[in-house]
Amino acid sequence: MFPRETKWNISFAGCGFLGVYHIGVASCLREHAPFLVANATHIYGASAGALTATALVTGACLGEAGANIIEVSKEARKRFLGPLHPSFNLVKTIRGCLLKTLPADCHTRASGRLGISLTRVSDGENVIISHFSSKDELIQANVCSTFIPVYCGLIPPTLQGVRYVDGGISDNLPLYELKNTITVSPFSGESDICPQDSSTNIHELRITNTSIQFNLRNLYRLSKALFPPEPMVLREMCKQGYRDGLRFLRRNGLLNQPNPLLALPPVVPQEEDAEEAAVTEERTGGEDRILEHLPARLNEALLEACVEPKDLMTTLSNMLPVRLATAMMVPYTLPLESAVSFTIRLLEWLPDVPEDIRWMKEQTGSICQYLVMRAKRKLGDHLPSRLSEQVELRRAQSLPSVPLSCATYSEALPNWVRNNLSLGDALAKWEECQRQLLLGLFCTNVAFPPDALRMRAPASPTATDPATPQDPSGLPPC
């Protein structure tokens, strides 16, 4: 129940091809609680949820939207690699379906109420776009929100000059944390409208704000989000969404209320039992009645999806020999189909080539600059320490060995070595002192007296000393 002063939002989670579940929920809300959609402050969506939110806000035919999802899934299943086949262009298909389904004034209806979750490529931050200037801009916002990198292509699309990718990467369920937000998700968990699995596992997996209970059914749903299941499975998911929407409305007292802004009176126990019985009847034998309440276009699409065409070509293609021959010819037909689809995409890409090439050059330069800066940072952290260790080790090995047992150890080093605080200066002065000591060892100072080199005259024979012995020959000394 919603009082007069209460405001509420509706948020649809991204889920790939399981978006047909959102179509069932939206059909239930539009049929049984139109006030809930009309009076909602904002209706948010991410990825496939953005497509349903756009259809719900702009008043587009939900039956046609559901039929488009089923047709796209059938086209993807026809190919050998499914959505990954080169000839399957999901972005082009989504754009064509939106152009055909949305009304001409869709951007006027959506501005201010619709919120599309996007992921900005430059920094990975989440952005919610709520204002649109034209129908093409609204369609481009949906294309950006559903663009899964590598799965849909390598070059992300542009909106208002900025590159965006799938909004589910950064925020798959916008504004889920607000208590007044009605959250819708095809995965069983803690969302307001979601499947109620009977698993007793209490563990949950939270992926970008989306609560997913850890059980086998959710694992199966996750596996079919990007690779579409059979049309019968999609039909059951749409019915499941319709049932879960009815359960939410009944549990909150919003089913078929003429004035929901007024508080509802308390419900007596007998009425609660009657409501529980109605829920049980709805679950057991009400599937046919549910199909009657679905939009006519969606009901027709669901019925057609369960019936195989009976023409001759379909019958021949389903025969076992033809299927075996087709599988054996895949190595030859796949390169040819890839070449044709590549040529077509290249021709369609020509108008955007200059802008995309410029963007790729900028991204390549940014990546290279980031790698260079990171390498410089790592080298700057390791090289100085390694070099200083090697220099200190080399200088330490060149020092003279001084025995530690020397009693006069303090006298072995000069005062400038003991008092210096810098090891490098001490080593430099020690080497200088060592060179001076070596020069002192190999240099000898010879001192001559002043008269050492003076010539002396010989002594006369008459002035001989009597104590000096005379030569017996009587000859004078030489």
From Swiss-Prot:
CDD domains: Pat_PNPLA2 (cd07220). Its EC number is 3.1.1.3, 3.1.1.4. Residues 30-42, 159-323 are extracellular. A motif (GXSXG) lies at residues 45-49. GO terms for molecular function: acylglycerol O-acyltransferase activity; diolein transacylation activity; mono-olein transacylation activity; phospholipase A2 activity; retinyl-palmitate esterase activity; triacylglycerol lipase activity. The keyword Hydrolase applies. There is a cross-link at residue 92 (Glycyl lysine isopeptide (Lys-Gly) (interchain with G-Cter in ubiquitin)). Pathway: Glycerolipid metabolism; triacylglycerol degradation. Phosphorylation at Ser-398 by PKA is increased during fasting and moderate intensity exercise, and moderately increases lipolytic activity. Ubiquitinated by PEX2 in response to reactive oxygen species (ROS), leading to its degradation. Ubiquitination is stimulated by LDAH. Gene3D superfamilies: Cytosolic phospholipase A2 catalytic domain. Pfam families: Patatin. Catalyzes the initial step in triglyceride hydrolysis in adipocyte and non-adipocyte lipid droplets. Exhibits a strong preference for the hydrolysis of long-chain fatty acid esters at the sn-2 position of the glycerol backbone and acts coordinately with LIPE/HLS and DGAT2 within the lipolytic cascade. Also possesses acylglycerol transacylase and phospholipase A2 activities. Transfers fatty acid from triglyceride to retinol, hydrolyzes retinylesters, and generates 1,3-diacylglycerol from triglycerides. Regulates adiposome size and may be involved in the degradation of adiposomes. This is Patatin-like phospholipase domain-containing protein 2. It comes from Rattus norvegicus.
